[in-house]
Amino acid sequence: MLYSFMCMQRPLSFGSLRKIISEHFLNLPDYRDTDKVDYSLHDVLMSGFAMMFFQDRSLLQFQRRLEDEIQQNNLRTLFNVEAIPKDTQMRDVTDEVEPSVLEPLFDNFFRLLQRGKHLESYRIRGDYYLITIDASGYFGSQKICCDGCLKKESKNGVVRYEHQILQAALMKPGMKQVIPLAPEEIRNTDGHKKQDCEINAGKRLLKKIRSSHFKLKIIINGDSLYSKQPFIVELKLGGMSYILVAKPGDHKILMEWIGEQRQLNEVSRLEIKDQKNRLHIFEWINNIPLNGNEDTPWVNYFEYWLQHDGKTTYSNPI
């Protein structure tokens, strides 16, 4: 008798995910004087989650949505919110919640996806997973600032204060859905005179990812900011592979080496013409020095061009 065994995906319902978030918020310690609050920390945070779920562009738009009685009932039933806070209270309360207390939620979701076999469709090159990292800003002002703000001064002397995060997400080409991991704040901290930066946040994020997912075979994907020796060394220490953009202006020695190898016909090349008469050009070479340092990492280089009517319409060196 023959048997065929299949790994069946276990469905994840919105209700089960919402329950996990709600329970986590209920267990968070409230930093406020509970005798003087009108809205529980749970209701404030769940309302914030609802705003993101409905994809409202602002707190004001979210509040306008809740002017409708049906929408209020949806918030209470779908998100288990008893008392709906006003926008100013939502802002004041959430601003004081440390992001670190929310990070376990990301790990919990990830493990649910693992147990339900949902991550298997994200595998690339056998059993690797591609994690893309990129920074984004979520607050900026020329007047309002705090001790954690990043300070940026323009050429004309205008000072701008910002808050940024470095976000990591598991993704795969062709898949519309991405799976976010816990982000890392880019912010100034007490006791450090030097301003925080994206690359330092990136190093912290790598350690966080490896600590949470120590068995996962990972490929980190990032822009040209990360294709420098200190970050690549950190990747290797974490046992991670990488695909990083390498701009010619940032890697003069690397480009000189590639140019010399190209003259010696040591660079592999493949050209493919598609049905639209566009020419796809691929070039690659393995095991070349990243820079001129004695302890330089040795890397692989790949470049792609798209040409149409003899003109390059797209290129990307990695």
Where are these regions (language model features)?
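Short alpha-helical patches at protein termini and domain edges
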Residues: 49, 99-103, 217
